[in-house]
């Protein structure tokens, strides 16, 4: 599958994680997730300052076909959210790994990154 960037980490619930350094990561949903959802029409993001455990609900994505929860792929405190998605949720369809990012986390334990899937393992998940 060509839409799985090798420089990111992933979880089976279709979120991606980009290591920004200094214990900060950017989180979004994968190309596969947005493809399954179809045209995204609404996004609910977590609150800045919210502390999320791995697997916690961190938002909602609604499309013309379905609604889906977004989960925290790793434990951390929400530092920033992509407020542009509130007025332009379709950005996730157009650029899920770039301008369509959801939120940034300050990790509780940066070593937790080792438990995430690499691109090859995620490709097997969605295979």
From Swiss-Prot:
Source organism (scientific name): Laribacter hongkongensis (strain HLHK9)
List the PANTHER family: GLYCINE CLEAVAGE SYSTEM H PROTEIN, GLYCINE CLEAVAGE SYSTEM H PROTEIN-RELATED
Xref: InterPro entries? 2-oxoA_DH_lipoyl-BS (IPR003016), Biotin_lipoyl (IPR000089), GCV_H (IPR002930), GCV_H/Fam206 (IPR033753), GCV_H_sub (IPR017453), Single_hybrid_motif (IPR011053)
Q: What family does this belong to?
A: Belongs to the GcvH family.
Alphabetized NCBIfam families for the sequence: gcvH, PRK01202.1
Q: What's the stated role of this polypeptide?
A: The glycine cleavage system catalyzes the degradation of glycine. The H protein shuttles the methylamine group of glycine from the P protein to the T protein.
| UniProt record, GO biological process | glycine decarboxylation via glycine cleavage system
Which cofactor is recorded for it? (R)-lipoate
Known partners and oligomeric status:
The glycine cleavage system is composed of four proteins: P, T, L and H.
Name this polypeptide is given? Glycine cleavage system H protein
